[in-house]
């Protein structure tokens, strides 16, 4: 006999926290999953110059392809968070990873289906964005339910370091594959590894019964009980929630601009430099920076510092100080200095994992996936505009300084908003959850 839908949903929601061995196993697995997510995501930026030469794209057209990822990415954030809150984030992550891994692996085939290269690549990037958009909201939902509050920042920073691992792996291995076998091999590499990871999670960490129950709850499309509805009116009446949204928007947009355009910046500004240096070093620095930020954040809280004080300190590093080094990138002609500034900016941005990303879980742990989805939707929309605007500014002015000025403006807007209005008290508690 199958359990009642409400009971199945409670089972899948994961009301119990992970034991220490379970937490260690899932943390390592999710670290690898985040790594592969960014392997797939950063494959296109690594290949942009070579693909532009093959297909005759200019910077505006390359900007369209790069930014089209965010057109899809912004549409599934809230859905991913809601599904994670409802059926369990691990199921959402597994199902989406199987799809984006397949799309990545067949991208070279799509590029050669017809002469409409730009249209097919834009379509594949939109689809990739749709599939990857559910990942971080579902991850936030999963960790808010399964990880102790005192360990949340460090766990999130470990898993979040996968973004740097993935970009580092693509930068290091991808640069060699690009030189030896051509740009197509990078997509085969990242897509194939993702599908292997999906098989591992399905084989060793999730049972077939778990996925069947999850799909069954979705297929029944039963209305969520009033007790489990998202108190969205209550949430968005709070200035702290809006501060979190604006800060996450700024952090995501700044990161997406640098992720999309830094490879092109180095290849055009320093054409004789070795690609593996500028594609590897910034992300190599970012990994220990991410882990250190999580350790420092949890240590300060355990020492008695207020949570909001620690979160604001992390954001000051992640948005404020990182933007200073981004500005420096536009005012140097030295390759070594550029690598140092890029490494410092990217490394300091990882402090956002222990700032705003965890602050969202502070504010609303019962619906953290939904709220993170809303905030990351705003960030993805800003990413679309930011990446396209960056390409337009460089095409019209011929200067990279405009791009880095844009990053600094966006970062400091988010920082100022969070410093003034940010809080860490729960805002999702109410005897009656309001709904439309």
Curated annotation (Swiss-Prot):
Belongs to the major facilitator superfamily. Sodium/anion cotransporter family. It comes from Homo sapiens. GO terms for biological process: ADP transport; ATP export; ATP transport; guanine nucleotide transmembrane transport; lysosomal protein catabolic process; purine nucleotide import into lysosome. It catalyses: ATP(in) = ATP(out); ADP(in) = ADP(out); GTP(in) = GTP(out). The gene is SLC17A9. The chain crosses the membrane at residues 64-84, 92-112, 118-138, 158-178, 181-201, 239-259, 276-296, 316-336, 369-389, 402-422. This is Voltage-gated purine nucleotide uniporter SLC17A9. It comes from the Eukaryota. GO terms for cellular component: chromaffin granule membrane; lysosomal membrane; mucin granule; transport vesicle membrane. Pfam families: MFS_1. GO terms for molecular function: ADP transmembrane transporter activity; ATP transmembrane transporter activity; guanine nucleotide transmembrane transporter activity; purine nucleotide uniporter activity. Widely expressed, but more predominantly in adrenal gland, brain and thyroid.
């Amino acid at each position: 006999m199958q359990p009642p839908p409400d009971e199945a949903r409670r089972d899948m929601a994961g009301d119990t926290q992970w034991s220490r061995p379970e937490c260690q196993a899932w943390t390592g697995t999710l670290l690898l999953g985040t790594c592969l997510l960014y392997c797939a995501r950063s494959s296109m930026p690594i290949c942009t110059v070579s693909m532009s030469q093959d297909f005759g794209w200019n910077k505006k057209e390359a900007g369209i392809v790069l930014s089209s990822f965010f057109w899809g990415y912004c549409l599934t954030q809230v859905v991913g968070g809601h599904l994670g809150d409802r059926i369990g984030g691990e199921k959402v992550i597994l199902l989406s990873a199987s799809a984006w891994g397949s799309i990545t692996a067949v991208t070279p085939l799509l590029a050669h289906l017809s002469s409409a290269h730009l249209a097919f690549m834009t379509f594949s990037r939109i689809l990739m964005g749709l599939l990857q958009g559910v990942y971080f909201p579902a991850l936030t939902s999963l960790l808010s339910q399964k990880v102790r509050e005192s360990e949340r920042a460090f766990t999130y920073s470990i898993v979040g370091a996968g973004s740097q691992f993935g970009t580092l792996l693509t930068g290091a291995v991808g640069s060699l594959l690009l030189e030896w076998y051509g740009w197509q091999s990078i997509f085969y590499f990242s897509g194939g590894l993702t599908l292997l990871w999906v098989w591992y999670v399905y084989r060793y960490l999730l049972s077939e019964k778990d996925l069947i129950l999850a799909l069954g709850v979705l297929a029944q499309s039963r209305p969520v009980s009033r007790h489990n509805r998202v108190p969205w009116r209550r949430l968005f009446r709070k200035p702290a929630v809006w501060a979190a949204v604006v800060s996450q928007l700024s952090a995501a947009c700044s990161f997406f601009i640098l992720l999309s355009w830094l490879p092109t910046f180095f290849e055009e500004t320093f054409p004789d430099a070795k690609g593996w240096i500028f594609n590897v070093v910034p992300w190599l620095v970012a990994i220990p920076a991410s882990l250190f930020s999580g350790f420092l954040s949890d240590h300060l809280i355990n020492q008695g510092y207020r949570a909001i004080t620690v979160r604001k300190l992390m954001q000051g590093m992640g948005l404020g100080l990182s933007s200073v080094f981004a500005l420096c990138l536009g005012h140097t002609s030295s390759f070594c200095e550029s690598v140092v500034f890029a490494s410092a900016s990217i490394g300091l941005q990882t402090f956002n994992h222990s700032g705003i990303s965890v602050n969202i879980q502070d504010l609303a742990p019962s619906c953290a996936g939904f709220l993170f989805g809303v905030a990351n939707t705003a960030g993805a929309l800003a990413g679309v505009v930011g990446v396209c605007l960056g390409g337009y500014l460089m095409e019209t002015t011929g200067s990279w300084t405009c791009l880095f000025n844009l990053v600094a403006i966006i970062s400091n807007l988010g920082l100022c908003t969070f410093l003034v209005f940010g809080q860490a008290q729960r805002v999702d508690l109410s005897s009656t959850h309001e709904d439309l």
